[in-house]
Amino acid sequence: MRGKKRIGLLFLLIAVVVGGGGLLLAQKVLHKTSDTAFCLSCHSMSKPFEEYQGTVHFSNQKGIRAECADCHIPKSGMDYLFAKLKASKDIYHEFVSGKIDSDDKFEAHRQEMAETVWKELKATDSATCRSCHSFDAMDIASQSESAQKMHNKAQKDSETCIDCHKGIAHFPPEIKMDDNAAHELESQAATSVTNGAHIYPFKTSHIGELATVNPGTDLTVVDASGKQPIVLLQGYQMQGSENTLYLAAGQRLALATLSEEGIKALTVNGEWQADEYGNQWRQASLQGALTDPALADRKPLWQYAEKLDDTYCAGCHAPIAADHYTVNAWPSIAKGMGARTSMSENELDILTRYFQYNAKDITEKQ
C-alpha cells in the first residue's frame, strides 16, 4: 500500500515538474515570439518596419520606443492568448501561401490588413494604445488647438484612439473612390425643368460667359422655355472681392466667380453694409443661361459627398460632423486634411461645400 502511495506521489511530482517546466517553456516561447526581432525574421515584415522607422513611435526626443508587441499584442489575459493564436495565420501566409511575399502583393492587401488591425483595436477600446497613453495623464491644455478640440470631443463622445489615429506607425492604405459613384451622380441630372424650380450644379458649371458656378449652388429657373434654362443666381458681394458671389454676408461660401461681363450684368439689390469685422457686403443677383446639366435636389450631391468622407476621411479618423466647425473654418480644415489623401481637386471641393452648407453657423441646413 505504501509502495503504491510512493509511486502515486512520484508520478504527481513528475507531473508537477513536467507541467511547471512546460508552462515556463510556453511562457518563454510566447515572450520570445513577441519581440521585434522575431517579427522581423519574416521577410514580409521588412516593408512595414521601414515605415515604422520614420515615425515618432520608433524615434523621438524622449527616447521611448514602442516595439511591435506594444501596439499589436495585448498585455495579458485571454486577449493576449487570442492574439498569439491568431498570429499563426501570419506564419502560414509567410511560409505557405506567399500572400504578401512581394511589394505588389503587400500593397494589394494593405487595406485588408489595416482594417483587420483597426477592427481589433476598436474591439479592445484601443487597449494597447492606452497602456502608454491615457486621458488622465494628458495635459490637454498644452496641446495644439486642433488636438484639444479632438481630444475633448473624443472624451465627450466616448471615442477610442483608433477612431482617429490611423496610419501613425505604418502608411495607411491608399483608398480611391469608385468611379461609378460619380457616373451615378451625373445620371441623376434633371432632364426637364419648370419655371420657379430650384436646380443645383453637381460640378463646376457656367452661366454663359458671365459666371463660373460652383457645385451645390442654388439656382432658380426663371425661363425654362429654351434649350438652356435661364436661371437666377442670388448672393452677396464683398468689397474688394467683387468678382465673387457668396452665400451670405460674413460667410465666405463662394457660390460663383464672375467675369468682367458678369460683374457688369449684376443687379445690385442693396447698399454696402459692414459686418462685425468691418468688411462691406451687399446683395446682388445675376441672370443668364445655364450651359451645363444640374440636379433637381441637393440630396444626391450630399450623398456623394458623404461617400467621399467615408472613403477618404474615415480611414484616418472618426467622422467629424459638419456642424462641428463654422462655414468659414471648414475650407482650411478640409484642405489640410484632403492633402493627405488621393482625393481629386473636384472631389475635395464637393466635400468642402457639403461641410460648409451644413456648418454649425448655417441656420437652415442645406
UniProtKB/Swiss-Prot annotation:
* Role according to the record: Part of the anaerobic respiratory chain of trimethylamine-N-oxide reductase TorZ. Required for electron transfer to the TorZ terminal enzyme.
The UniProt entry, under PANTHER family, shows:
CYTOCHROME C-TYPE PROTEIN, CYTOCHROME C-TYPE PROTEIN TORY
Q: Any ranges marked Periplasmic in the topology annotation, and which?
A: 28-366
Cytoplasmic side of membrane: 1-6
Q: Which residues bind heme 5?
A: C313, C316, H317
Post-translational modification as stated in the protein's UniProt record: Binds 5 heme groups per subunit.
- Sites binding heme 1 sit at C39, C42, H43
Q: What InterPro entries does the record point to? A: Cytochrome_c-type_ET (IPR051174), Membr-bd_4haem_cyt_TorC (IPR009154), Multihaem_cyt_sf (IPR036280), NapC/NirT_cyt_c_N (IPR005126), NapC/NirT_cytc_sf (IPR038266)
Residues binding heme 4 are: C161, C164, H165
| Name of the featured protein | Cytochrome c-type protein TorY
Membrane topology field: Single-pass type II membrane protein
Query: Which GO molecular-function terms appear in the entry?
Result: electron transfer activity; heme binding; iron ion binding
